[in-house]
Amino acid sequence: MTKDQREKPKKLTGIAVSPGIVIGKARLVDRSRVKILYQYLIDEKQIKWEVERFEEAVRAAKKQIIAIREKMPKQIQEHSFILDTHLMIMDDSMFHDATVETILKERINAEWALKKSLQKINKLFAEIEDEYVKERVVDVEYVAERVLRCLAGKEQESLFEIKERVIIVAHELSPADTSSIDIGKIMGFITDVGGRTSHAAIIAQSLRIPAVVGLESVTWEVQDGTLLIVDGYTGEVIINPDDNLIIHYQEKHLAQKELESSILRMSHLPAKTVDGYKIAVMANIEFLEEVAAAKDHGAEGIGLYRTEYHYLRGNELPGEEELFSDYKEMVELMAPYPVTIRTLDLGGDRLSPGAGTKTETNPALGLRAIRFCLKNPDIFKTQLRAILRASAYGNIQVMFPMISGLQEFLDTHAILKQVMGELEEKGIAFDRGIKIGIMIEIPSAVSVADILAKHADFFSIGTNDLIQYALAIDRINEHVAFMYQPFHPAILRMIQHVVKVGKEAGITVSLCGEMAGDPLCTSLLLGMGIDELSLNAWGIPAIKQVIRSISMEESKADLERILELDTAKKVREFIEQRMSQLIPYLGRKDLNAEEGSLRGRAQR
């Protein structure tokens, strides 16, 4: 094929979940779902055999997952809990027992019964608003798919079998798939579906291979051997790039690597502005295995430790000793830095069957987080005892989510005081001066922040939920997600108000959520007077570098101008223009994905 006959370049844009740039050939991996062709009734004599057929498929699926876990690359063995979760799902009553019961009661084949169980589970997850928790339904779907393949006698191609350097292209990748990645063979991956909090994204970040998800139709656009460029910084994928584009992205790759190396080398330096203002930059984590990455990237503590995992992974609620052991190890690993533990932020609809709760029609606005804990004090006290006991081993702070007003906080604080009293009576050590904070993520809490500040030791502004609730936007709803605007003037005024009243009360105000990890927001938040930022570990070096490149004086001056602007668009344009002046590499043309021969030809 001559140069003139070559297909024209085409650009798709998805969600960048792991940074880096790779240029290579596509390897299309079939991950299409098994179609249930036969749904049939069985007679009484066949019931026992059909149940055994299902049980045998589950056993076979378990063996496959165990084999994958044993072959996992050492770089991602810390994420083996993902596969452990899949093994537990197969034993979960809603998955396993419900399917067996359906076979027995309705006298239908195992495939049909499993499909019915999956539909019920999907319905439960569909009612959940929390993005991270909602995406966990894919784990159940992956497990069901594996069992269905075992029932049908169909095997998938394993990524272990790939022998050449390629870019994986798939509709979606399961945790078992990404756990099979050999970084000596697989340069990166791109998928039609997926999100920032998917297991595939987490694994890609751990392996440091570029990945873009949510491309919608890439499997229709690409064939085996198609030349691709994957930009894990911007979420762009170039199909059939021309020579100019290849050269451009090669140069961008080298420039980014040079920049990242420089920033990473300085990640353990303090986040101090050029005029001497110091701000703490901490990590958001969910698993103990993430502590090493947090420390390696210069985290000065854990600003948000999500504790929901223990409540999601099994059939029973976690016990006090299990929680205590986890929290104690966490604080010891992070010493001498602080660890802020957020208490349970789920509704009963997502807890283990041991919670004995019922499904709600709108859980996001229902009995969740602190509301659920106040309604279920025994569950709450178990977690509080574990947190308090762990506080004897290091610097722990406790934070309550979804507080809407003072009475809720006072009721919560009363339970904490009660647990403290019980521990004192038993002579169990804990930090009697433990700091108690409030997650500011509901508009009503913003309105009464001045009142709350008189009773709390610190605030943490949870921007993800605050933006959703304040703008009435479901950011994972594709029809309105574009309206999710961190730079909306209303959001900026809310944040500024919380910081102002926090300062007046003499308490620390931190901020977590996607805004904390966005370099475009850093100067703005500094100007407001935020004391701490908490974000994903891999983003810490870049944020610290931005802080070291600007002055508080300039940030405050820019803030005054920003607060006069009346639309999110104007705010973003102003910030982008100012950041390109203050921090040249944020606006460098050689790092700008819009440059090159594809300008004007972007396709979605």
Regions found by a protein language model. Name each.
Residues E260-E594, R604:
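Conserved alpha/beta-domain cores
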Residues M1-L333, V339-L346, G356, N376, ...:
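Non-catalytic, soluble scaffold/interaction modules
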